[in-house]
């Protein structure tokens, strides 16, 4: 009898089969119904993910550009400071031969008994120095017997003019003025006739 009882339990009952079929059908329908909802969520999630990725990429690009700009700014600041610090190097190197000439003249002063030779040596040094200044764009401001020009000259004294023609003109230059590429770098100090 036990065998029969076991057989009955093993053989599925038609009622149980229909219940199982209904459950499977219902779960399958639920899956089908939830599939469009999941697709809609994916569609909504995709743009959000895309925008998030795009935002991250833009932030990364922004940070890189800011770092690059900061490095550029630091590099140019360093270059400018080096130019300011070492900008006069060429000028000073070119002046060294003039200093050498002065040193030679000073060392030979004791041996020279002729003032004409000393004068000639100093004139050579002066000429060499003035040539160098002209190559750099430095020029003397000519003032002799010219009308007083306040843009180029500073009047340090006014004296009675020796003649009527010299009234308002430069009579003497106390300190020579210079221009660098047509810009006054030192005004001439002059005596003007009144």
Swiss-Prot record:
One GO BP annotation is: protein folding
| Induction context | Low level background expression highly induced by oxidative stress due to hydrogen peroxide.
Instruction: Report which superkingdom the organism of origin falls in.
Output: Bacteria
Keywords, sorted A to Z? Chaperone, Cytoplasm, Stress response
**Where is this gene product found?**
Cytoplasm
Q: Where is this region: Disordered?
A: 1-44
GO MF assignments: adenyl-nucleotide exchange factor activity; protein homodimerization activity; protein-folding chaperone binding; unfolded protein binding
**Basic and acidic residues composition-biased segments:** 1-12
What's a GO cellular component annotated to this UniProt protein?
A: cytoplasm
Q: Does the keyword Cytoplasm apply?
A: yes
| Major location category of this protein | cytoplasm
Q: What else is known?
A: The grpE-dnaJ-PG1777-PG1778-PG1779 genes are co-transcribed and may form an operon.
The record's comment on protein family reads:
Belongs to the GrpE family.
Functional summary from the UniProt entry: Participates actively in the response to hyperosmotic and heat shock by preventing the aggregation of stress-denatured proteins, in association with DnaK and GrpE. It is the nucleotide exchange factor for DnaK and may function as a thermosensor. Unfolded proteins bind initially to DnaJ; upon interaction with the DnaJ-bound protein, DnaK hydrolyzes its bound ATP, resulting in the formation of a stable complex. GrpE releases ADP from DnaK; ATP binding to DnaK triggers the release of the substrate protein, thus completing the reaction cycle.
| Protein name as it appears in the record | Protein GrpE
Q: What taxonomic lineage is listed for the species of origin?
A: Bacteria, Pseudomonadati, Bacteroidota, Bacteroidia, Bacteroidales
Q: Which gene encodes it?
A: grpE
């Amino acid at each position: 009898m036990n065998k029969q009882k076991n057989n009955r339990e093993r053989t599925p009952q038609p009622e149980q089969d229909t219940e199982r079929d209904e459950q499977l059908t219902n779960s399958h329908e639920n899956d089908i119904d939830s599939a469009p909802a999941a697709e809609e969520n994916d569609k909504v999630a995709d743009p959000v993910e895309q925008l998030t990725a795009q935002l991250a990429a833009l932030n990364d690009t922004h940070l890189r550009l800011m770092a690059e700009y900061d490095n550029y700014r630091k590099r140019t600041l360093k270059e400018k400071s080096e130019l300011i610090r070492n900008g006069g190097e060429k000028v000073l190197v070119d002046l060294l031969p003039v200093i050498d000439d002065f040193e030679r003249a000073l060392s030979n002063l004791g041996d020279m008994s002729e003032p004409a030779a000393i004068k000639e040596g100093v004139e050579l040094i002066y000429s060499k120095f003035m040539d160098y200044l002209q190559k750099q764009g430095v020029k003397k401001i000519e003032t002799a017997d010219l009308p007083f020009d306040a843009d180029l000259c500073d009047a340090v004294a006014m004296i009675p003019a020796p003649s009527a023609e010299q009234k308002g003109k430069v009579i003497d230059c106390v300190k020579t003025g210079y221009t660098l590429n047509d810009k006054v770098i030192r005004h001439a100090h002059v005596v003007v006739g009144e």
